[in-house]
């Protein structure tokens, strides 16, 4: 049985994206290795305290950036955090800008996702006898996004609050035709990881908001060099430093009790009659379904 490893105070999770493989300012840091019913998460988690709050940090692509977007075990990552009683997630990622107004090193806080992936199997915890359909009309926690917007702007960063993040598979970047199409469709930024995390966090009743750091203009600006891994390295390093400055101020403002709408996302999502739930599936999902057992 995969019971919760932290039945104390609700914790905060930070998922680090490209260029962000550590988090500064953690008191009493220690590494935690977790096995989940879905396999291993991307890497060991780092546990520590910031502003007297329990925080867990997970590098999405593993330290040393060893995992492609399509190789990520999103279920294991989110399940591992939920098993540690994480109820809020700050998800950090690099994105390409599809609009002139979003410049490299700007921060975009997406309010919507458009999922164009085709290689992300298993973006749900449910099945095997228990059916649930969570609402994703608003996939981002408005409350957490508002905190991040206020604190990041207060630190002097250029913040764009709201926007549509289109999620592609990768690992190759877009063609010019694709990039221009995405622009004309009205999408704001493009990335490779955000949508799956938002879906699974909602099923796990975790409030999630995404900090998307702009590194490039994708390839729609014909007067600029098209995006490449080498051209974005400097922006990645600057963005990682910015993220480390933002975390403490945001974490300090997150409430102590998980009472936002996302924390009760399963109230009207579970379809299968409780009497019909298979015991094996219940054991597997105990961390997520604890309120209903």
Give the residues covered by each predicted segment.
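Non-catalytic positions within long, well-ordered alpha-helices that form the structural scaffold/packing
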Residues: 82-85, 183, 202
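Short acidic/polar active-site loop segments enriched in Thr and Asp
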Residues: 87-88, 188, 207
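Zn-dependent metallopeptidase/amidohydrolase metal-coordination segment
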Residues: 192-230
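A short, charged, Gly/Pro-tolerant segment at domain boundaries
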Residues: 259-293
């Amino acid at each position: 049985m995969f019971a919760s490893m932290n039945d104390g105070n609700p914790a905060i999770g930070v998922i680090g994206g490209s260029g962000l493989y550590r988090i500064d300012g953690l008191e009493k840091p220690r590494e935690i290795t977790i096995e989940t019913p879905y396999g291993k998460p991307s890497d060991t988690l780092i546990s520590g305290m910031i502003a007297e709050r329990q925080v867990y940090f997970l590098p999405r692509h593993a330290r040393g950036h060893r995992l492609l977007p399509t190789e990520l075990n999103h279920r294991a990552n989110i399940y591992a955090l939920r098993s540690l009683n994480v109820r809020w997630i700050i998800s950090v990622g690099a994105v390409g800008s599809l609009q002139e107004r979003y410049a490299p090193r700007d921060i975009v806080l997406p309010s919507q996702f458009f999922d164009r992936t085709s290689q992300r199997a298993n973006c749900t915890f449910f099945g095997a006898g228990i059916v649930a359909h969570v609402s994703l009309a608003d996939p981002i926690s408005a409350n957490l996004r508002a905190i991040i917007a206020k604190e990041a702007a207060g630190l002097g960063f250029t913040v764009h609050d709201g926007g549509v993040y289109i999620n592609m598979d990768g690992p190759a970047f877009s063609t010019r035709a694709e990039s221009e199409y995405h622009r004309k469709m009205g999408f704001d930024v493009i990335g490779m990881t955000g949508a799956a995390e938002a879906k699974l966090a909602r099923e796990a009743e975790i409030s999630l908001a995404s900090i998307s750091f702009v590194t490039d203009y994708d390839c729609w600006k014909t007067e600029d060099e098209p995006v490449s891994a080498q051209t974005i390295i400097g922006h990645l390093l600057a963005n990682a430093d910015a993220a480390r400055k933002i975390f403490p101020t945001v974490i300090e403002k997150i409430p102590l009790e998980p009472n936002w709408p996302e924390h009760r996302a399963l109230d009207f999502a579970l379809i299968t009659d409780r009497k019909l739930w298979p015991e094996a599936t219940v054991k597997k999902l105990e961390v997520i379904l604890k309120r209903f057992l």
